[in-house]
Amino acid sequence: MAGTPHIMIVESRYYEEIAQHLIDSVLKELSDAGARYERFEVPGAFEIPAAIGFALEASKLESNATAYDGFIGLGCVVRGQTTHYDYVCGESARGLQDLALKYSAAIGYGILTVENRDQALARARRDGFSWNCDSFDDA
């Protein structure tokens, strides 16, 4: 990639406090890397792959569509009392992996899958998002 990387961030802010910790660490990493970014919000983690997929498909089909060098999906899924958690976690991960393979796209997976709010906060507050930004070094 030549020049300044342009990153699409797709975030679910369903759990506002957790989402804020995640985006703060991502924006710090992108700022440190000198990257440009655009943020898009979706209702939940399940919708993150679709939003990224729409952008990838648009850039392939439309000459005036915004082209991104990489993508970051951010969200949090907390286990509840039904199987909904399993479906959302599995399908959001599978959806992003399928997109990465189909389009040879650099996609950072920043969707926390946790048992409870305390665990989510502990993971969201940890050492930033650097654990997931290495994929953009080679984008």
Where are these regions (language model features)?
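Glycine-rich phosphate/diphosphate-binding loop of Rossmann-like nucleotide-binding domains
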Residues: 2-39
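C-terminal binding/interaction regions
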Residues: 85, 90-139
